[in-house]
Amino acid sequence: MACPRDVRTVSQVAGKFKTIEIRSEPKQTPPYRPLVEVIKAEQVVHTLNDVQGTLIGFRFPAAASSVNVADWHFHFLSADKTRGGHVLALTTGDGVALVQEISDLRITFPASGPASSASPESIKAVERPGAKSSE
């Protein structure tokens, strides 16, 4: 999806997808390990074919990378709500896409704990494995 590089955007795509590759991790319990460790050891990747469902995505510009990984970030939930996860790859089918620029977003960040200490490098390793830094 093309959009100006400095615009925050939210997207919902509902429809039937020819293929979609998603990843998920088992539920974790305290003390929480860094996500990059969990993904290396326990990530499960599923490829779904001809599946009905919804993608929800956010796109943040590089200037907002402290809030979310720059560029698009999508999650998927099947229509029957039995399968879902972080989208790694997909082939579209039929569907409807809704895209909206967002100027306001309210986020409550944890004051302490594992989420407050995630490094940009570990986030990039989880969200964009193998990606080269654009900085």
What are these regions (language model features)?
Residues 27-29, 72-73, 91-92:
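Short, solvent-exposed amphipathic alpha-helical segments in soluble enzyme
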Residues 12-14, 23, 56-59, 75, ...:
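Residues in well-ordered beta-strands of folded domains
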Residues 4, 67-69, 90, 100:
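Short solvent-exposed loop/turn micro-motifs enriched in small/polar/acidic residues
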Residues 78-120:
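A hydrophobic, small-residue-rich beta->alpha segment in the mid-to-C-terminal subdomain
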Residues 116, 121-130:
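N-terminal targeting pre-sequences for secretion and organelle import
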Residues 69-77:
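Histidine-centered divalent-metal-coordination microenvironment in nucleic-acid enzymes
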Residues 1-58, 65-67:
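Long, positively charged binding patches that form subdomain-scale interaction surfaces
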